[in-house]
Amino acid sequence: MQVNRDLGAEFAAMLAAAEWDVALLQECPPRFAEPLARACGAAAHRALTARNSLGALRAAAARLNPDLIASAEGGSNLTLVRAAGSLGGIAERRELVIHHGRPERRTMALTRTAAGLCVANLHASAHRPELAAADVQRAAAAATEWAGEAPLLFGGDLNLRPDADGAVFEQLRERFGLTGFTAPGAIDHLLARGLDAVDPPRHWPPRRREIRRDGLALRLSDHAPVEGRWLIPYPPRLDDASVNSAI
């Protein structure tokens, strides 16, 4: 079911009801950052990506006719860290442009939590696996250097599939120590370094990502959320810290 109206409240309700400590969102309208953070009791780190010139005008058009403007509203990578969770909020925010120019500007949000966990949130180039591979490898090099010895969660829409782009995932493991993927044919992934996996990344089942409107099922995104759970084996600040993450 498709409706031509703003769905910010529905996104906020679904995200707030889910269980997580850190959430990584891509292609998120920039105006959603504050309402989502408030609804979830979270601190936010927003990194703008593409199509964000004249942002106020784009946002106004999106409120009036979301279907007409669609992704032309502008985008961002948004990382949310629940202040009351085991990660203790956000201690440091950085961002890095990982792809300049055509086809689109791509950025990565780098977030260090108060518990010491580092989070890299990115959206790699679409429809061009060679560009996506370059984006992801550049991002992994920067993220691991920035994180140092701290545990790292590296995730987002990588636009790479392990069954077709296996060499890239092997390089991520060998060069950067980043392991784990969602499924062989998936493009949304949560990879980890220095974390003990409790529940490996997996897609939400279809019914979990649907809401009911007028007796019909409405999906808020064409991407199924991915969630996983890890333990921080040596938390720098908190004892028995864990990470429950979703993208």
Language-model segments: which ranges?
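Acidic/histidine-rich helix-loop elements
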Residues: M1-L7, A56, S125-E130
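Structured beta-strand-rich core segments of catalytic domains in phosphoester-bond hydrolases
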Residues: N4, C28-A115, H203-P205
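Active-site beta-strand/loop signature of hydrolases that rely on acidic residues for catalysis
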Residues: F11-L36, V119-L122, R138-G166, L191, ...
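Metal-dependent phosphoester-hydrolase catalytic domains
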Residues: G88-A91, V97, E130, T144-L152, ...
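Short beta-strand micro-motifs in enzyme catalytic cores
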Residues: S76-L78, R105-A109, C118-A120, I187-H189, ...
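Alpha-helical scaffold elements lining the catalytic groove of polysaccharide deacetylases
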Residues: H127-A143
